[in-house]
């Protein structure tokens, strides 16, 4: 007998988010020893988190039976100290994507317009469609703020999403260009700046750094999101945050379920913020190893996007093999990269790994691109 539940009609136009392939799947499909698998498809920190973070979590294991402090005051105080903010301008979430969900449900009504880049983080579209919004996008792979501005004038969007540095392309917008753009946007449009990769962009080019406090002070219609999944190595703990004006934050809290961040996640994130030297070491490795991928691309005449994140995007066009074919070939060797076919790109997104991982990945890629 078929299911008779009257599901919402909007579900007919929705797709589930497709995450990067996990190690467990590769073990099941190809029987490869998990210790031999190189996972560079999800932009995780290949070194993991700081040892002090693991120690804090180990010591707190016995607290798993208790609900967390739902005020998350210690965590918010640590984030506030990092950004020179008051805690009433911060909301934590189960990953920054949960905070993005809060934003959409807080702001969007049926039929509202949302403006995104054509190639961008998939959850913006998914969350907006769940709210019944209409999606409008620019035509370019990388961000074109002039195109954003033209469309914004035409459709008067309720929300604009800017992902900088961008995922999955890796491009980044300069602070001056973003501020000029924001000055031309109506105050009744919320502009979300997704800064999941901001630490990487700042290290490479300080002109790409958009300070959370400054931008939200200057532009009250800006909401800034960050994560502990990338530079801090806490992807598996699922913790992120949002920063905005007090009125916006207080309304977002109305959308937040209780205890949305676990005890251990909150403790880990709070401790992670005390380890900037660890972060700096990882950033140094990222940019040193990025040069190897850029050199390889130049030698092989591979088109790529200048990246300001912890990954690089290689285009496979004119190479004889599609990105899907290359990704599958490497997958059988235990190397997980991200095929961008779901973004309508014949391209691979490659997380920058540890030096010894990159040795093997570059060797395998040379055979595929030769």
Swiss-Prot record:
It comes from the Bacteria. Its cofactor is pyridoxal 5'-phosphate. Pathway: Amino-acid biosynthesis; L-histidine biosynthesis; L-histidine from 5-phospho-alpha-D-ribose 1-diphosphate: step 7/9. Its EC number is 2.6.1.9. It is an enzyme of class 2 (transferase). InterPro entries: Aminotransferase_I/II_large, HisP_aminotrans, PyrdxlP-dep_Trfase, PyrdxlP-dep_Trfase_major, PyrdxlP-dep_Trfase_small. The keyword Signal does not apply. SUPFAM superfamilies: PLP-dependent transferases. The modification N6-(pyridoxal phosphate)lysine is found at residue 230. Pfam families: Aminotran_1_2. It catalyses: L-histidinol phosphate + 2-oxoglutarate = 3-(imidazol-4-yl)-2-oxopropyl phosphate + L-glutamate. Keywords: Amino-acid biosynthesis, Aminotransferase, Histidine biosynthesis, Pyridoxal phosphate, Transferase. The keyword Cytoplasm does not apply. One of its GO terms (biological process) is L-histidine biosynthetic process. GO terms for molecular function: histidinol-phosphate transaminase activity; pyridoxal phosphate binding. Homodimer. Belongs to the class-II pyridoxal-phosphate-dependent aminotransferase family. Histidinol-phosphate aminotransferase subfamily. PANTHER family: HISTIDINOL-PHOSPHATE AMINOTRANSFERASE, HISTIDINOL-PHOSPHATE AMINOTRANSFERASE-RELATED. NCBIfam families: hisC. This is Histidinol-phosphate aminotransferase. The lineage of its organism: Bacteria, Pseudomonadati, Spirochaetota, Spirochaetia, Leptospirales. The gene is hisC.
